Amino acid sequence: MEFRSGRAADRDAITGLFREAFGRRMARREWEWRFLRKPAGRGLIELAWDDTKLAGHYAVSPVRLRVRGKDVPAALSGTTMTHVWYRGLGLFPLLARRTYARARQAGHVLVMGFPNRYSHRGLVRDLGWRDVYEVPRLSLHMGDRRRETEDGGVAEVVELERFDRRFDRLWDEVKDTCPVSVVRDRRYLQWRFAENPESRYRIFALEDGRRVSGYAIAKRYGEEMHVVDILCLNADTGVRLVRRVAGTAARLGLPVVSMWLNPGLELRRELERLGFQPGAPVTYFCVLPLAAASRLRGACDFRNWYLTMADSDVY
């Protein structure tokens, strides 16, 4: 078995393994968007080859974190694949350790991830990951509350196609509200949502003259509307944005609006008053520290995080 770093020429073999592992095709533009065009940098990919057969794949993609007033490099874990012929041979831990060594060498302070129930135990037991939180889904089952979620009073909420410079100003205003968060500047938002080749997101923003005081990103998934990301100057703005998303969901006949939001936030408490409740499914959130504790400064404590569905590569 040969282990080496992935490169652009391996794209066809990687997308072929993706189809075998997940039962769907990954288009060339999706692969390039995910691994080559991310604003924080190119993905770190490690591969296991059996002669000309791609047996295993693991990758992390760079992210910029805001940690207590400083932007620091980090990475998001994702896209773990082993060909069915080679499962049970221990390829994943070998690929993971190679990937983490490269990430540490590149200066990343941590790797963050959202493992499923199959991979969680091995990451924590064998690879040094730490549990940060089990994130519940915060859901509104509208029912009799439909009238409370209608669009009255949210006329200033507009729907946009792209992100302009006002979103950089919004980020500058709120970036140190929570001690730890993924950098949500205009460039990141444009890549993550407007340029995503596989998913369609709806961008809602509350305009206040020439500024934007908040945004919410929504995506339909089955019979639910997900608030994939939300960022705002204050809780009142957030409530107005969520009400707009809920009103849109109601018009589409969707009975549930769901999201992730840290329980320590004022907006979370206001949404609970509106009828949102935490529940299943619950998602593991873990980190692998790669730097000294002085550089992490509380990144292993969920109370410090601003976390939404957008921080996962699933939504």
Residue ranges and their predicted role:
Residues 110-151, 215, 219-236, 243-315:
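Active-site/acyl-donor-binding loops of N-acyltransferases
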Residues 85-88, 94-118, 122-124:
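Membrane-interface helix-loop-helix junctions at boundaries between adjacent transmembrane segments
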Residues 50-55, 59-68, 217-223:
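Acetyl-CoA-dependent GNAT
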Residues 82, 87-101, 235-247:
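Conserved acetyl-CoA-binding loop-helix of GNAT-fold acetyltransferases
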Residues 12-50, 104-106, 120-121, 125-229:
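Amide-forming acyltransferase catalytic core, primarily the GNAT-like/NAT-type
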Residues 71-84, 223-234:
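Conserved acetyl-CoA binding element of GNAT-fold acetyltransferases
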Residues 8, 61-65, 80-82, 115-118, ...:
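An acidic- and aromatic-residue-enriched active-site/binding cleft used to recognize and process polar
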Residues 46, 56-58, 75, 80, ...:
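Conserved GNAT-family N-acetyltransferase fold
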